[in-house]
Amino acid sequence: MLVLALGGHARAEAPVRQVFLVQDSGWMEPFLTAEGSQFRPLVEALVAATRVPGADMAVATFDQDGQVPGRPSPRILYDGAYDAAKVRAAIASIDLPRKAGGTAYADADFNGALLGAIRTGLRGRDGVIWMVTNNKNSPGNSAEVERNTAAFYAALRDSAAISRIVAYPVRMPLKGRNFSEGGFVIYGIGYGAAGGRALESAVSAPALKALFSHPPVSLKPVLAGGLTLRFDRLDTGGLQAGLENGVLIVSGADAAAGTALRLTAHLRNGLYPQRVAAARLALSWSEVGTEAGLAQAAVSPAEIAELAPQAESGPLSVVLTLPPIQRPSGLAGLLSDGRTVDGTLTLRLADLRLALDPAFLERVRPIFGSGLLSGDQMGGPVGDARAVEGRLPGLFRDYRGVSEASVSLPVRIEAAFSPWPLIAAASAALALAAAAGLGALALARARVQTVMLGTVPKRVSLRPYRTQTLRAPDGSRWQVRAGLWGPARATRLQESGPGA
């Protein structure tokens, strides 16, 4: 495993360094010496396609450190900002070094090259390493070199410091003076979190896509960006639904009655070169908040098979059922016109079985079909696709450990409550307010009424619930009080005696 410590995270806007590491051991002879070889122009194009403005880069070669006197491995040929002429000169200077004291070409130490590229090329910090190699060692290498080769693949697979790996197998049949080759591999290795993001950005860029006729092989993680859902029809039954910034928004659902949303979806296999040989499908719903499981989801068919790389499945019927939603109690619930339900639809692929695309195996047969293997490959004849797969580096076979996958889609359901309870409450409030207004008006207005003061009628202007004292023709005093309705009432007051 890698023992180098990751450096501190660079600022988000700071580009990371890149190292272009080219193998120059003996098995690279046809690529470096054959007449008409397009190897060097392709490496130049790789550097140009992945360059990042403002970022430094390095061009280096690797073989086996210590085999060539005075020549370290990796050997930096150029270090600095991208300059097409200087990069071209550096790549043109790549040669085939020979071991000390003989004519044999140098061997290759992949693990030493990886560690050296991190220490020297990346200076121990996050970055991207592009390793151009034919994945071969001499069969006469020492046990130490074989251990180093195995350690190289173990580091790529197991080290948490290496966050992302892609590979571009390149067919390039060439014949040199001593060897014939069918092609080589370009590995993109993201070191550290920032290096992984930079590598992902590079492989998504149009310039690099234009350089290769096939997508890169995603080696780590295997399922990186591989499976996605696409909706092409929303059978909403009168509802409004659509995708906004990756979220499925459904509006107009009836909260009181509940609703069922029917969608037609397709599962896209963005993996390469793995095909989905078989998988069982199950759809689940998880909701944000306390009422988890409020909605229910289902998908049919329940199985999928033979989904080719970079292809879409047939139509999948997705049903999302939302039961009735209770209006919250109290005034807040009465005033609420609806409720928003946030959740996630998750399509799970269980018993997932991936397999390599036969067309890919046929394409890479000349690259990996040689009898000379690196420490992570398996032997055997190369008569069929299974044998070719057995000769791939183990990283290319790590997909066999994947047995499940999932695809998630955020969903927001905007359910509306009926306005009638609010209308009824508002009407009652208006009626009450009107009655209160009429009552206040009646209280404030005086009415002329006829009041009986004993046997004598008298007309007087009275306000409701206010008392007046009147004197009758015979000199008696009366207290008069009127209400909102009915006649006013008169009460005779007791006269004070002369001694009072």
Regions found by a protein language model. Name each.
Residues K136-A194, A355-L395:
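VWA/integrin I-like adhesion module and closely mimicked acidic/polar interface patches used
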Residues I249-F417:
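Membrane-proximal extracellular "stem/stalk" segments
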Residues A14-L21, S25-V59, A143-S159:
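…and closely analogous acidic/polar surface helices at protein-protein or active-site interfaces
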Residues P69-V128, A167-P173:
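Von Willebrand factor
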Residues A155-A253, A260-L261:
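Von Willebrand factor type A / integrin I
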Residues A444-A500:
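Cytoplasmic C-terminal tails of single-pass
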Residues A416-A444:
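Selective detector of the "anchor" transmembrane alpha-helix that sits immediately C-terminal
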Residues V22-S25, D126-A143:
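DG-centered beta-turn motif at the end of beta-strands
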